[in-house]
Amino acid sequence: MTSEAAPASTAVTYKRVMLKISGEALMGDQGYGLHPPTVQRIAREVQAVHRLGVEICMVIGGGNIFRGLQGSAQGMERTTADYMGMLATVMNALAMQAALESLGIFTRVISAIPMDQVCEPYIRRRAVRHLEKKRVCIFAAGTGNPYFTTDTAATLRANEMACQAIFKGTKVDGVYDKDPRKFADAKRYETVSYDECLQKHLGVMDASAIALARDNDLPIIVFSLDEPGGFCGILRGEGTYTRVQG
């Protein structure tokens, strides 16, 4: 396996980033599960950024397989439902690892819940070393605790890994004052503050994740994962997105 990176002279906005995507992003047009061509397409987007020399962390949700809140709403104990959701994120992480490694990118799946035969346990210093060696680190199983979302896990790991920004890949090209898929007059923000996101319930991330980013001055870049080259373009200073900051 080879792992190509761009020359050090390549101009990029950030040197180490966290990419957060939902589990639903992996299911394509299906209503459930994994759509291998979609997983491969996202992996190629990550590959393009990796070639710039950027160190990449990832967190992937599990909603395409199981969502803890939905299980809880249907009568399942919340803690059990959340653990099931965490296991779903491990499945998605392994699928993404396979896709990235098929493109020649060394990748490590790092789980907050130990499962040594499947992936590595989370050890912060080891994970940092993987990044320094230009390996993609996919953090799975959330924080390892129920009642915390993968958005919060992504923000926590981004801070622990000293990422310079969180990139939140979504279905739309930024943060809007209302759903642009339903309202033609929806306005996209170029920048928006953490507090405004919380006060107006703009749906960027859950409140705990936004507060954790705010308290550590960690910007959140919201962009469309469906836009070819969008992730790479933003790191080159191009593209359409919303920046959430103080």
Curated annotation (Swiss-Prot):
**Coiled-coil residue spans:** none
Q: Which UniProt keywords apply?
A: Allosteric enzyme, ATP-binding, Cytoplasm, Kinase, Nucleotide-binding, Pyrimidine biosynthesis, Transferase
Q: Does the keyword Plastid apply?
A: no
Q: What domain of life does the UniProt record list for this protein's source?
A: Bacteria
Q: What segment(s) does the record annotate as region Involved in allosteric activation by GTP?
A: 28-33
S-S pairs = none
Identify the EC number(s).
2.7.4.22
Q: Where along this sequence does the record place binding of ATP?
A: K20, I21, S22, G23, G63, R67, T170, Y176, D179
| GO MF assignments | ATP binding; UMP kinase activity
User: Which biological processes are named by the entry's GO terms?
Assistant: 'de novo' CTP biosynthetic process; UDP biosynthetic process
Answer whether the UniProt record assigns the keyword Lipid metabolism to this protein: no
| Places the protein is found | Cytoplasm
- Predominantly, its location class is cytoplasm
Q: Which reaction does it catalyse?
A: UMP + ATP = UDP + ADP
Can you quote a single GO CC term? cytoplasm
Q: Which residues bind UMP?
A: G62, D82, T143, G144, N145, P146, Y147, F148, T149, T150
Which Pfam families does the entry link to?
Answer: AA_kinase (PF00696)
Q: Which InterPro entries match?
A: AceGlu_kinase-like_sf (IPR036393), Asp/Glu/Uridylate_kinase (IPR001048), Uridylate_kinase (IPR011817), Uridylate_kinase_bac (IPR015963)
Q: How is its activity regulated?
A: Allosterically activated by GTP. Inhibited by UTP.
Sequence similarity? Belongs to the UMP kinase family.
* Assembly and interaction partners: Homohexamer.
Q: Which HAMAP family match?
A: PyrH_B
Could you tell me what this protein is called? Uridylate kinase
